[in-house]
């Protein structure tokens, strides 16, 4: 990644609103940049900081259009503590501690993916979810509008690492979709305290229990957390660099640009 990321002022801004399954109308700003096959980049808890903007640059430079919803927090900098408070206040959108069902915001992202697919005239989009949005990527791969998904350090539900932030119906739908679309990617550090080995085992039990690899996990050495952003090291041969290269190759093989 370059030393200076393209700032948010270099993005095209729009607004997307849609009703979640609970009936709540959700509205957020959307930032777009680049051309090519669309990839929806979902922010992690620290926010859309410089590291996330650098990740977006990597995707744009690889030939993708980045579509980045602004879900919470300041733009251009990280705010872990402040954003945690903000998300806790967005109870109609996020359910941080809930297992066996997802957050309403995941419904909104699904509708966003469908709109992007239809607007761009493509077969489907890619999705990257990170940290508290990581589980959303696992759920969204079950939708026809999503052809490829990456869950980086999926941490929700917090304090329940042996459970998933999605319903049994969601799991079944994603399993069936992955049988057709091929394995998605999950990224995590081996000793991540927020996305633990217990979480890894939970994902494998849910998706790879019958010997069919629906979720391909890329495990990196160390105790980091944010594989593609805060803990990313842009050096040839570094595990995080190799993980990002794998993600780009995965998207390139599964997504097609607009005609």
Language-model segments: which ranges?
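N-terminal cap/leader regions of alpha/beta-hydrolase-fold enzymes
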Residues: 1-259
């Amino acid at each position: 990644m370059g030393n200076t990321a393209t700032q948010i002022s270099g993005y095209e801004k729009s607004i997307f609103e849609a009703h979640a399954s609970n009936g709540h109308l959700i509205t957020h700003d959307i930032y777009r940049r680049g051309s090519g096959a669309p990839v929806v980049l979902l922010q992690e808890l620290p926010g859309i900081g410089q590291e996330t903007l650098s990740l977006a640059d990597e995707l744009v430079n690889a030939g993708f259009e980045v579509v980045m919803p602004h879900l919470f927090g300041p733009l251009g900098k990280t705010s872990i503590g402040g954003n945690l408070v903000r998300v806790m206040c967005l109870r109609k959108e996020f359910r941080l501690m809930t297992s066996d069902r997802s957050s309403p915001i995941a419904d909104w992202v699904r509708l966003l993916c469908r709109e992007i697919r239809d607007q761009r005239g493509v077969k489907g989009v890619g999705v990257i979810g990170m940290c508290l949005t990581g589980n959303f990527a696992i759920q969204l791969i079950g939708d026809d509008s999503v052809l490829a998904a990456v869950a980086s350090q999926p941490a929700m539900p917090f304090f329940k690492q042996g459970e998933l932030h999605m319903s049994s119906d969601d799991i079944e739908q994603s399993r069936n979709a992955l049988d057709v679309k091929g394995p998605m990617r999950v990224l995590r550090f081996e000793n991540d305290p927020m996305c633990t080995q217990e979480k890894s085992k939970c994902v494998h039990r849910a998706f790879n229990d019958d010997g069919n690899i629906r979720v391909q996990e890329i495990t990196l050495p160390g105790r980091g957390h944010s594989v593609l952003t805060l803990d990313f090291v842009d050096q040839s041969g570094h595990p995080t660099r190799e993980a990002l290269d794998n993600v780009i190759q995965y998207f390139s093989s599964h997504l097609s640009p607009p005609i």
